[in-house]
Swiss-Prot record:
Leading EC class: transferase
Gene transcribed to yield this protein: tmk
EC number(s) given by UniProt: 2.7.4.9
Record's keyword terms, sorted: ATP-binding, Kinase, Nucleotide biosynthesis, Nucleotide-binding, Transferase
UniProt-listed PANTHER family: THYMIDYLATE KINASE (PTHR10344), UMP-CMP KINASE 2, MITOCHONDRIAL (PTHR10344:SF4)
Family per record: Belongs to the thymidylate kinase family.
Native source organism of the sequence: Ehrlichia ruminantium (strain Gardel)
Protein name, entry field: Thymidylate kinase
InterPro entries the UniProt entry points to: P-loop_NTPase, Thymidylate_kin-like_dom, Thymidylate_kin_CS, Thymidylate_kinase
Residues annotated to bind ATP: G7, I8, D9, G10, S11, G12, K13, T14
GO cellular component, as recorded: cytosol
Amino acid sequence: MFITFEGIDGSGKTTQSRLLTEYLSGVYGVDNVILTREPGGTFFNESVRNLLFSTKNLDKLSELLFFIAMRREHFMKVIKPALTQQKIVICDRFIDSTIAYQGYGHGIDCKLIEELNDLVVDIYPNITFVLDSDINQSVARSNKNGYEFLDLEFYARVRDGFRDIVKRNQYRCYLITNVDATKNINEISAIYLKTIKILHAL
């Protein structure tokens, strides 16, 4: 099973992906559940991630191509081998973040991004949880964690992008609305577990 968490920076998806990993590891064993993230997930990718996030004014198409190349490396080295071994993979960000951020946020053609994604991966998530949180709360939380601040209009476009992605992919995407990531951690986790149990009889 392949589960992804999506949302704007500071939405709480990293916390929720970790909590779900801990729960499923208790059920299926730590060796059968993999928690990973994008951009990153391999030693090489983590090094490139640090370089990208410390580089200012990088051309947006160049940035996209870096992300796509990193996704291929991550998919072939981590995600696909784990799924082939029947493990549960939980990923903090995947293809939808690229569409929301680079497409809706930065204005790159979403069709181009989708075609590039199709070029580098051939397995897609079974379940994607999209955390839809208040932009001001999320940005404040993101800044506290040391992430680069982008203007509120940018995050509004990204948020709209995630909502559109959910509408177009209702077979796998679930929008978790009105998220206050600082207060409802256990309540939100229960929603994920209930959804997964219903869909896959875990």
